[in-house]
Amino acid sequence: MSTGSISDVDEFHESELLDGLPKFGSGKDPGTSNESTEDSSNCEGASVSECTGKRRKSANMRRSAPNGVAQEGKQVQRNAANARERARMRVLSKAFSRLKTTLPWVPPDTKLSKLDTLRLASSYIAHLRQILANDKYENGYIHPVNLTWPFMVAGKPENELKEMLNSTRLCGTTAS
């Protein structure tokens, strides 16, 4: 931040001296000329912000000089990432469709969102846990006869079901 003090002028001169020196790890030796030193000599009459803007532009141009090669590399990476994402989404969609077909009380022609599918699967799992916990078999079937579609076990709302499940955890699992 410029305050107009003498120290600002000193900082400006120090930055000019440092601009002429090679940066650590830049891979350039001090004997080679670069565009930034040429730009700084052209900026003697210009303001500090104009000079730094020109230096930034020339540095960006140097970095992107092999523009075609860099763009091709980026495009290849982008295409590979897109292919991975498409494959991931195919696997996820297939898993959801298998989950929908395993839910016994959902009509096959019913369209369900992913959230609805997960909620129904959760209530079905809760029903199966309840059966295992109570050792109840209704008419000899282990099937969710009392389940109402969607999201209810034996007429209980989902929040009451969560409370019931938290009190009767199986296999030593902990509440999340």
Swiss-Prot record:
Efficient DNA binding requires dimerization with another bHLH protein. It comes from the Eukaryota. Residues 1-84 are annotated as: Disordered. GO terms for biological process: artery development; branching involved in ureteric bud morphogenesis; branchiomeric skeletal muscle development; bronchiole development; developmental process; diaphragm development; embryonic digestive tract morphogenesis; epithelial cell differentiation. It holds the Pfam family HLH. Its main location: nucleus. GO terms for molecular function: DNA-binding transcription activator activity, RNA polymerase II-specific; DNA-binding transcription factor activity, RNA polymerase II-specific; DNA-binding transcription repressor activity, RNA polymerase II-specific; E-box binding; protein dimerization activity; RNA polymerase II transcription regulatory region sequence-specific DNA binding. GO terms for cellular component: nucleus. Residues 76-128 form the bHLH domain. Residues 31-44 have a biased composition (Polar residues). Keywords: Differentiation, DNA-binding, Nucleus, Transcription, Transcription regulation. It is found in: Nucleus. This is Transcription factor 21. Expressed in the cranial paraxial mesoderm from 20 hpf and subsequently becomes restricted to the pharyngeal mesoderm that will form the muscle. Expression in the proepicardial organ is first seen at 40hpf in a cluster of cells between the myocardium and yolk. Also expressed in the developing arches. Expression begins to surround the heart by day 3 of development, and by 96 hpf, expression is restricted to the outer epicardial layer surrounding the myocardium. Involved in epithelial-mesenchymal interactions in kidney and lung morphogenesis that include epithelial differentiation and branching morphogenesis. SMART domains: HLH (SM00353).
